[in-house]
A protein has these predicted regions:
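Electropositive, gly/pro-rich neighborhoods at or near active sites that engage anionic ligands
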Residues: 2-112, 117, 122-129
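Short phosphate-binding/catalytic loops that engage adenosine nucleotides
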Residues: 111, 139-140, 221
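A short acidic (Asp/Glu
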Residues: 123-129, 154, 214-219, 234-237
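Long, charge-dense
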Residues: 128-187
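Generic beta-sheet signal
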Residues: 144, 209, 224-228
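Catalytic alpha/beta core domains of metabolic enzymes, predominantly
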Residues: 177-193, 213-214, 224-226
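Internal active-site segments that recognize and position negatively charged phosphoryl groups
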Residues: 188-217
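C-terminal functional extensions of proteins
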Residues: 201, 216-272
Length: 272
């Protein structure tokens, strides 16, 4: 490993080993039956599984599986219906390289960027690290539409959710101000609409996941994001050219396990 500031930067082989050991890639925690269910729901265009994207044409479950084999590395056997599923760590590494290269471009151009997450439990610290690197490189980190509120369906009744920021990172919070998991593209749509209404320039790049990335990509904004093996919409979005980069990885392991990933990305992007 090499040093970058106070971080230890793994080389490619070391990071690959870490991805497999931590189950960020390789044999991941998400079971096959959950993946197949999500593939089917996305193919049926269930809004909760589209992440704000509007795919072209018809996507049958077998078509979604084929994309997920190629772009994520899930088990290709269509008769494998339950149990262990996988993410190819080499596809993760390739995705991280493309992700870092797009961040490097943003830094060179000093772009206007929104950094956001629908997975605050696992990924908020990672995104804070990326946002700090972009800020230090001269990018403008946008924080629009704070306190914009909407209702989300819930089994026990609609729940209020609002846009808030943890440092420069956008999140959705509940009525107590606690960050919450979300697939919704409504927050990024509200942000983009608010910027347009005030005549402010739209972001050059959105860095995120779930509906933050999908909704931005659907709106024509360059969008890069992490996506789990049960998040087929972002990979379909990448297949169709709406999502610039979809990195296959488990998006909800313990936060400290993403530190080597952040160090690698920042180093490759020249932001460390």
């Amino acid at each position: 490993m090499t040093a970058a500031g106070h971080r230890r930067v793994p080389d490619r082989a070391e990071l690959r080993s870490h991805l497999v050991r931590s189950r960020i890639a390789g044999d991941v925690a998400t079971p096959r039956e959950n993946n197949l269910r999500h593939f089917r729901l996305m193919s049926e265009r269930h809004p909760g599984y589209l992440f704000g994207l509007e795919p072209d044409g018809t996507w049958a479950p077998e078509d979604v599986l084929a994309v997920m084999v190629r772009r994520c590395g899930v088990v290709p056997d269509p008769t494998h219906l339950s149990g262990q599923d996988t993410i190819d760590p080499d596809l993760t590494l390739g995705g991280l390289d493309a992700y870092a290269d797009r961040l490097a471009l943003a830094a060179r151009r000093r772009e206007r960027v929104i950094v956001a997450t629908g997975h605050p439990d696992g990924l908020l610290d990672f995104y804070r690290t990326i946002a700090r690197g972009l800020l230090d490189a001269g990018c403008t980190l946008l924080r629009p539409a704070r306190d914009w509120t909407y209702k989300t369906p819930a089994s026990e009744g609609a729940k209020l959710r609002s846009i808030d920021y943890r440092g420069p990172v956008a999140v959705v919070v509940d009525g107590d101000g606690e960050p919450r998991h979300t697939h919704s593209a409504r927050p990024i749509r509200a942000i983009l609409a608010g910027l347009a209404d005030t005549g402010e320039a739209l972001p050059d790049l959105v860095v995120g996941d779930h509906g933050w990335t999908g909704g931005a990509g659907q709106a024509g904004i360059a969008a890069i994001g992490f996506a789990d093996c049960n998040d087929p919409a972002l990979f379909v979005g990448a297949e169709e050219g709406r999502v610039s980069v979809a990195v296959p990885l488990d998006d909800n392991v313990e936060p400290h396990l993403y530190r080597p990933v952040a160090a690698y990305v920042l180093d490759r992007a020249g932001l460390s």
